[in-house]
Design a protein with these regions (language model features):
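Membrane-embedded beta-barrel scaffold of Gram-negative outer-membrane proteins
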Residues: 287-303, 409, 417, 444-502, ...
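Short acidic/polar hinge/loop motifs at secondary-structure boundaries
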Residues: 91-119, 436
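Flexible loop and strand-edge segments within Gram-negative outer membrane beta-barrel domains
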Residues: 184, 188, 217-225, 231-290, ...
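Extracytoplasmic beta-strand/coil segments of soluble accessory domains associated
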Residues: 52-95
């Protein structure tokens, strides 16, 4: 439940306003939904951040990465990255080849709103999210005239970040152009605990050993992103929109800590050119709304590996996706009923080659969903959703979701929520057709999920606001797809696992005015997520039964705190991931377990207001305590490093 809003925000003006009571009704579209919202203030902290960085410090979900500009994946509630659906302005951007999304390729400055849909709540947005879904969108900032925002960032390891936004609004038109450019040698130093150097005496006897200090080799990157938005609002209130996003990326793949060769002997890099475009139309009236969207995705991926000028891998992939959707909703206000529906089509065309092998495949993916939400009284709501999907020529079983919520006490705004759902995920095109190893006989992964939660929100208007929530969840997933070695010398996917994931997620936020010009905001989240293989052994030597899944921490947590005084702002960010096993048997011999780690970042910003422009100066320290850690086996992470950002927003209308 939310507080009755008054137009002035105490976090900005610090004015004394009398207390108010909480009486507003929860939006009907949110009935039974377990979600985490990340606002633009967090998304636009600094231009060097990707969505992987944002999610690490602002949620309890697991972000797996091996440093900046490297593959970064996200997983909910003990599931895998392919069980997370990602939607950008209505367009699903999961790779049809791999089934997952690289969040390091999504600059946070290109996103205005991000919502995490946990568990069953993802079904309303997309099928296949056995763990959850991430919903990303851009929003118009309607202002007449020209606008400009430029930020220059300089950081350690020869890192340079640039952001430029040009806006123009006149009448019913609004245009926005954003450009993000990042480049770095990324050659930080680290202590290599996977190697030992001997110490010799004068007689060449070994008298000791030490772990050498090395540089991150072959790790440079250069990324360019251009996002164009165009909006038009008709006299009747309808809206037309265009969103076009182009990416050009060159990334070297760093050498592992176990590589003994010199960097000039290797060429190991990947290139990506991609375009994502969506056009939309929204017809909005008092009680009903209808919308239509069409989109297109083109992606060209290139991966090259050579050693001593001998090319051993030259992989090329082209992906074309055509997208269309129609949606609508109707509200019976007097009866407290909201009906909605959506039909979406994705047609994927993939051509992948590596020398003389590869595959050429296409698949249509049709999805339809209907939902009904009923709120007969202010303190109670019920929702039911049914989704049906077609993958190629195969229909899935119906995907139902039932959710209920109710306010059990207005004192403290205590609300209980529960839901149950069935879900599934179809094999990716690589699972089916990759050569060598693809398995066209794979079955879809299916599962049942249950969760229940409690939340409370209290506060004193213009003094403080506190919100806490906790959720319990449980999922059973069958026919989990796993790539296994074969006697033919390559890996092939099989439906082998039955996985039981369960646990608790908790969140808390506090906003408080300490004094007239002092403000404090705290946000925290934590998750305990055992995810265990409970299937039958696939061989006599299978020791994975009853063990935690690899690269799934049982515990994770994050905290952000912002202290503001007039034009000064201090931001502290902390995140923690528990130990992760690298083997399905949880064997800790050699490097079978990655130790837990704690990450601490801090930022200090000062804003300046002149008649002709607003300026900002920000300094950031990452890995404040210079912790030595790894997130992925044999991939070193950077120690303490520094960044400086300078931003400017000219005031065209006020300039004389």
């Amino acid at each position: 439940m939310s507080v009755k809003a008054q137009e002035r925000d105490w976090l900005r003006d610090g004015l004394e306003i009398p207390d108010v009571t909480v009486t507003a009704r929860r939006p009907m579209r949110d009935i039974g939904v377990d979600q985490t919202k990340i606002d633009s203030a967090m998304l636009h902290q600094n231009i060097s951040l990707s969505m992987a960085d944002i999610l690490s410090f602002n949620s309890s979900i697991f972000v797996k990465n091996s440093g900046r500009a490297t593959l970064s994946t996200v997983s909910f509630r003990g599931t895998s990255p392919s069980h997370t659906q990602v939607v950008w302005n209505g367009l699903r951007i999961n790779s049809p080849m791999l089934g997952m999304t690289d969040f390091s390729m999504i600059p946070s400055f290109l996103v205005d709103k991000a919502t995490l849909l946990h568990g069953s709540s993802s079904v309303t947005e997309a099928g296949g999210g056995l763990g959850g879904a991430v919903k990303l969108s851009t929003e118009p900032t309607i202002e007449d005239g020209f606008g400009l925002h430029f930020v220059q960032g300089v950081g350690s390891f020869w890192t340079f970040d640039d952001f430029l936004r040009l806006t123009y609004g006149k009448g019913r038109w609004y245009s926005s152009t954003r450009v993000v450019f990042s480049t770095s040698k990324n050659n930080y130093r680290y202590r290599n605990y996977d190697k030992k150097e001997n110490i010799y005496d004068d007689q060449h006897n070994i008298v000791g050993q030490y772990y050498p200090i090395e540089r991150n080799r072959n790790a440079a990157f250069r990324d360019t992103h251009i996002l164009q938005e165009l909006y038009y609002k008709t006299k009747s209130g309808d809206r037309l929109s265009l969103n076009a996003w182009y990416t050009n990326s060159y990334r070297e793949l760093p050498l592992l800590t176990t590589d003994y060769g010199s960097s000039p002997e290797y060429e190991n890099y990947q290139r990506e050119n991609s375009f994502r475009g969506v056009v939309g139309y929204d017809h909005i009236r008092r009680n009903w709304r209808i919308g239509a969207k069409a989109g297109y995705i083109f992606t060209h991926l290139g991966y090259d590996y050579s050693y001593n000028n001998v090319a051993t891998t030259c992989s090329r992939s082209r992906i074309n996706t055509i997208y269309g959707s129609v949606e609508g909703n109707y509200s019976f206000e007097e009866k407290g009923v909201l009906l909605s529906g959506n039909i979406t089509l994705h047609e994927n065309f993939v051509r992948s080659s590596d020398g003389t092998i590869g595959y050429d495949a296409n698949r249509a993916e049709l999805s339809a969903v209907v939902s009904a939400r009923w709120q007969p009284i202010e303190r109670f709501g019920l929702s039911a959703t049914l989704r049906e999907e077609l993958y190629g020529k195969e229909w899935t079983l119906p995907i139902p979701v039932v959710a209920v919520e109710g306010v059990v006490s207005k004192k403290g705004n205590i609300m209980l929520r529960a839901s149950a759902s069935r879900n599934h995920r179809a094999p990716s095109l690589n699972d089916l057709y990759f050569r060598p190893g693809g398995n066209p006989d794979l079955r879809s992964e299916t599962g049942w999920s249950y969760d229940a939660g409690i939340s409370s929100e209290v506060g004193r208007k213009d003094i403080y606001k506190l919100r806490v929530s906790a959720s319990w969840f449980e999922s059973w997933i069958e026919d989990w797809i796993l790539w296994l070695p074969t006697n033919k010398g390559f890996f092939s996917p099989r439906n082998v696992k039955k996985v039981h994931s369960y646990g608790v997620e908790a969140q808390a936020s506090l906003a408080v005015r300490l004094a007239k010009d002092w403000r404090l905001e705290l946000n925290g989240s934590a998750a305990w997520t055992p995810s265990v293989n409970v299937g039958a052994p696939i061989s006599a030597g299978d020791n994975s039964i009853g063990k935690q899944l690899p690269y799934v921490p049982r515990f994770s947590a994050s905290v952000t705190g912002r202290l503001s005084f007039r034009s000064w702002s201090l931001l502290y960010k902390w995140c923690h991931y528990g130990e992760r096993f690298t083997m399905s048997s949880n064997d800790v011999a050699l490097s079978g377990k990655l130790p837990r780690y704690f990450m601490n970042n801090i930022e200090l910003e000062k804003q300046f207001a002149f008649r002709w422009a607003d300026l900002s100066l920000k300094g950031a320290i990452n890995n404040l305590f210079n912790e030595e850690y790894i997130s992925v086996l044999a991939h070193p992470m950077p120690g303490i490093n520094f960044e400086i950002f300078v931003g400017i927003r000219p005031k065209w209308a006020k300039r004389k």
